[in-house]
């Protein structure tokens, strides 16, 4: 009698589990985005900035060419980023796969806040795959009038992300590994470094060996256009539409 009861109970659990799997996928679909006007880098005129005054004559003297400087040293790569943030006067467009809440991540975010405070328009596009521990910070930063943050291909289940992996693997496996950094449409920095201690010789455990390239010239135009394509992609969601302010105790 006990065995039959156990079998019946197990069957009920299995049936309930199957029912859950059949009904939940409808809930995994990302919410429909609010209608948005596409944004493009050159909507902001950066032709009179200090960086433009330096770069424009070089481009006029070398039409169609690209100048570059390879950043092998991690501290030089960090200094280049911070210096570009400080020099930007109109816009900063940043795209990263990983941005951690560590010393490097915090240092760069504080620099971006200072830039936004002086009127620079900041667009930050982050892949959502590693954003779980940062989403509350992103949501708070997005309250700034000059900071816009989007998450690329976000998880529908914010707390239990494994559910997306089980129920929507094909979509969730499409990740954005791009790393680009653009100041006033004039200077771009691309490469393998994310914004995390391990990429800048700051981690106390291990370091990644990566390289960046700083660019001026025609290649920058391609990087600007690529950023715009990702920013306006259907998979790029404003953090305000995905992350709950109530969950992170924000108004």
Residue ranges, per PLM feature:
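Bacterial N-terminal signal peptides that target proteins for export
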Residues: 2-14
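C-terminal motif of bacterial Sec signal peptides marking the signal peptidase cleavage site
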Residues: 23-26
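Bacterial signal peptide processing site
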Residues: 28-31
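Short, low-complexity, disordered segments immediately C-terminal to signal peptides
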Residues: 33-41
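HKD-type phospholipase D/PLD-like phosphodiesterase module
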Residues: 48-50, 57-88, 98-251
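Short acidic, glycine-rich surface-loop motifs adjacent to enzyme active sites
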Residues: 94-96
């Amino acid at each position: 009698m006990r065995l039959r009861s156990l079998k019946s109970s197990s069957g009920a659990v299995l049936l309930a589990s199957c029912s859950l799997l059949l009904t939940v996928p409808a809930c995994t679909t990302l919410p429909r985005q609010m209608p948005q006007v596409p944004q493009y880098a050159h909507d902001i005129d950066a032709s009179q900035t200090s960086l433009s005054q330096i770069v424009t004559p070089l481009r006029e003297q070398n039409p169609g060419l690209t100048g570059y400087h390879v950043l092998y040293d991690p501290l030089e790569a960090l200094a280049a980023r911070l210096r570009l943030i400080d020099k930007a006067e109109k816009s900063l467009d940043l795209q990263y796969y990983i941005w951690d809440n560590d010393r490097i991540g915090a240092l760069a975010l504080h620099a971006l806040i200072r830039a936004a405070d002086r009127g620079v328009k900041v667009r930050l596009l982050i892949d959502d795959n590693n954003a779980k521990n940062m989403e509350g910070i992103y949501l708070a930063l997005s309250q700034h009038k000059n900071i816009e943050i989007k998450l690329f291909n976000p998880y529908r289940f914010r707390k239990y992300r494994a559910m997306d992996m089980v129920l929507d693997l094909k979509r969730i496996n499409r990740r954005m590994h791009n790393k680009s950094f653009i100041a006033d449409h004039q200077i771009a920095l691309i490469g393998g470094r994310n914004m995390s201690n391990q990429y800048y010789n700051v981690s106390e455990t291990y370091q990644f060996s990566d390289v960046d390239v700083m660019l001026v010239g025609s290649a920058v135009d391609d990087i600007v256009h690529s950023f715009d394509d990702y920013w306006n992609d259907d998979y790029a969601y404003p953090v305000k539409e995905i992350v709950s302010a109530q969950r992170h105790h924000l108004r």
